């Protein structure tokens, strides 16, 4: 038997994980957090500034649509704002992981918090998507008529704000997977 060979039943203690891989994942984590923060901020601002008044409003009756008229849209703006704030604050921890790539406990905490924020972001985006779908297509079973034919600008803006939120959802999945890989390499 060769001197360097491993017998069956023995555990090989190969070379420790390269710091370059973990550091590269940490740098990518930092960049993805910035992109996700921009996406959630854009979604919150896009939905939060949505309003339209129809041109045939009278002096006493105004036909207008505002995001705050729908509680689901308020939840969407709130959840995106909370997640954006978290992402900005987590940049400090992400930078710490670039400097100290051997930190494991803080990575576990970050994976836990990322998962919580992923859940919050997904619920806000999914709930808003259901309402946007109803606004575009209505529901004939409940006699809810689509109102996007009248409020065209309003519907375009609320539909567009969903895009940034779902981009952030995908980025959170990538962030969680990258953090898990980073932890497993220690």
Swiss-Prot record:
It comes from the Eukaryota. Its main location: membrane. It is a multi-pass membrane protein. GO terms for cellular component: plasma membrane. It is found in: Cell membrane. Residues 48-72, 132-162 are extracellular. The keyword Cell membrane applies. Pfam families: CASP_dom. Keywords: Cell membrane, Cell wall biogenesis/degradation, Membrane, Transmembrane, Transmembrane helix. The chain crosses the membrane at residues 27-47, 73-93, 111-131, 163-183. The keyword Cell membrane applies. Coiled coil: none annotated. One of its GO terms (biological process) is cell-cell junction assembly. Residues 1-26, 94-110, 184-186 are cytoplasmic. Homodimer and heterodimers. PANTHER family: CASP-LIKE PROTEIN (PTHR36488:SF12), CASP-LIKE PROTEIN 1U1 (PTHR36488). Regulates membrane-cell wall junctions and localized cell wall deposition. Required for establishment of the Casparian strip membrane domain (CSD) and the subsequent formation of Casparian strips, a cell wall modification of the root endodermis that determines an apoplastic barrier between the intraorganismal apoplasm and the extraorganismal apoplasm and prevents lateral diffusion. Belongs to the Casparian strip membrane proteins (CASP) family. This is CASP-like protein 6.
